Structure formats: C-alpha cells, structure tokens
C-alpha cells in the first residue's frame, strides 16, 4: 500500500439522509486501498478553500476500481462536494492512515463493531472483511434520530445489528453505550472491539473494556495536512507522566488501541 495522488472520476453520488451523501469514485488509486478504516484527503475544487477534506473509505471494490465514501455536509468544502455530478473529477490523496488491525481475530471468534453518526461509514468495509475471515460480527450503531439514520440494511446483511437513537425514534432510546452495557450484562464478551465515532462514545467504550487487549478506536481529530507534517491532529499517550509524548492521528492513526492513547 502506497500513498498516491490521482484525479479520480465520480461514478455516482446520492443523498442517503439529511446532509449525508454517498460518493462513488473510480481510479487507479483503488488498487492501493486494502485496509478498512483508512481515509482519503480530497481537494475542494474551489480556489479559496486550500485545505483538503479527510473522508473515510466506506467500501472498496477492486474488480471495478471503485471506492465509496460517505460524508456529512459540515461546511463550505463538503457543500461543494455535494453539488458534484457523475463524470466530474476530484483530486484525491490516499489512502491515508493505518487502518484497523484484523489480524488479531480468527474464524469462529466474535467482534463487536461500534459506530456513531458519521463514524459509521468506515465500519462497513471492516465488517465485510471480518466476515470474509469467518469472524462473527455484532454491530452496535447509534444515530441522533431516525431521520438521519442510514445504512441499516447494509449492516444487517453482514450480521447481528443493534440500533440506538438519542431521541428514541429508532431502536433503543439512548446511545450505543447502553447497548454495549446490556450485551456485557448478558455475558457476551467479544474477542475484539472496533469503534469509530465521537469522543464521548469512545470514552464510554474505553471505560467498558478497561483491560481488554484488543479494543481499537478510530479517532476523529481535525486534520490539516493529512500526512503527519503539520502536527495539527496530535493526541497524548497513556502512561506519559510528562505529557510531552504525543501521536499524530492522521499518520500514526487514526486507529489506536484504547490502551495507547488519552481520549
């Protein structure tokens, strides 16, 4: 896997939910995409918007040299992306980041996959690859409300799936931490835990599995360069009494073991 840059072609784009879009891209760069949990850095085709936007990879299709991204419109850059049509091109840098480690689980073992909001997309490729290994996946997905929920059927097709919404309009009332607590209370202990979402959700997972050796968290930090040069996305390491040791989320991450970093 190498980091490369390419003008990739938009194959299709559609809206999944309010402010949530699915973007399919085609190009040679897909050959370099292998590990779930990686992301790409996209140049906004507007002269006044200089910083690239990091967007996680939702699906990889090597046979058609396509990849799928799912993003939420948050500002001027993603607003531009949402207006683009099939046939147009985007300047893509990637794949970036380390990706999830799926070597620690084997066929017949169980993995909890936990996602919240816009942290859900990269977990689909992860679940797909774990399925291919024969790992039993159990999904715990949280949304703000039924209105903004997406990709439910896709995850359900891969394995057991539990949903929660903040307002109780779909699935359990509350957050995914409640779903995890209920699963643990029933004696369901996973061989590995993979999660991506807001910092509060990741902290809850860290507290639920304080000594588990295989809890992997994908951190959502603001990024600028995406290649570890600017130090805009650092987080501190656990066990560092000086507070001076840090890791770069874009380059050394975005995935870390829960035992490694301070959330």
From Swiss-Prot:
Record keywords, A-Z: 2Fe-2S, Electron transport, FAD, Flavoprotein, Iron, Iron-sulfur, Metal-binding, Pyrimidine biosynthesis, Transport
Superkingdom of the source species: Bacteria
Record carries keyword Protein biosynthesis: no
Cofactor requirements of the protein: [2Fe-2S] cluster; FAD
Annotated metabolic or biological route of this protein: Pyrimidine metabolism; UMP biosynthesis via de novo pathway; orotate from (S)-dihydroorotate (NAD(+) route): step 1/1
Residues bound to FAD: 53-56, 70-72, 77-78
Domain FAD-binding FR-type: 3-102
Binding of [2Fe-2S] cluster, residues: 225, 230, 233, 250
GO molecular function: 2 iron, 2 sulfur cluster binding; electron transfer activity; flavin adenine dinucleotide binding; metal ion binding; oxidoreductase activity
Disulfide bridge positions per record: none
Subunit structure, as described in the record: Heterotetramer of 2 PyrK and 2 PyrD type B subunits.
Function: Responsible for channeling the electrons from the oxidation of dihydroorotate from the FMN redox center in the PyrD type B subunit to the ultimate electron acceptor NAD(+).
Protein name (record): Dihydroorotate dehydrogenase B (NAD(+)), electron transfer subunit
Phylogenetic placement of the source organism: Bacteria, Bacillati, Bacillota, Bacilli, Lactobacillales
């Amino acid at each position: 896997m190498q980091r490369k840059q390419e003008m990739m072609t938009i194959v299709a784009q559609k809206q999944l939910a309010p402010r949530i879009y699915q973007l399919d891209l085609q190009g040679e760069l897909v050959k370099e995409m292998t590990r779930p949990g990686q992301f790409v850095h996209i140049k906004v085709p507007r002269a006044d918007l200089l910083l690239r936007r990091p967007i996680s990879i939702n699906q990889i299709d090597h046979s058609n040299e396509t990849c799928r991204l799912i993003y939420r419109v948050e500002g001027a850059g993603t607003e531009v992306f949402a207006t683009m049509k099939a046939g147009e091109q985007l300047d893509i840098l990637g794949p970036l980041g380390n990706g999830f480690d799926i070597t620690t689980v084997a066929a017949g073992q169980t993995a909890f996959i936990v996602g919240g909001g816009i942290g859900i997309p990269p977990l689909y490729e992860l679940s797909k690859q774990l399925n291919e290994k024969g790992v039993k996946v159990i999904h715990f997905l949280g949304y703000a409300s039924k209105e903004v929920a997406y990709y439910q059927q896709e995850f359900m097709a891969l394995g057991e799936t539990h949903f929660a919404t903040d307002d109780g309009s779909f699935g359990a009332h509350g957050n995914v931490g409640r779903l995890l607590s209920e699963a643990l209370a029933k004696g369901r202990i996973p061989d590995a835990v993979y999660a991506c979402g807001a910092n509060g959700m990741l902290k809850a997972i860290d507290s639920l599995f304080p000594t588990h050796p295989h809890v992997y968290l994908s951190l959502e930090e603001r990024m600028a360069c995406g290649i570890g040069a600017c130090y805009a996305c650092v987080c501190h390491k656990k066990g560092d009494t000086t507070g001076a040791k840090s890791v770069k989320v874009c380059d050394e991450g975005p995935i870390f073991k829960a035992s490694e970093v301070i959330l």
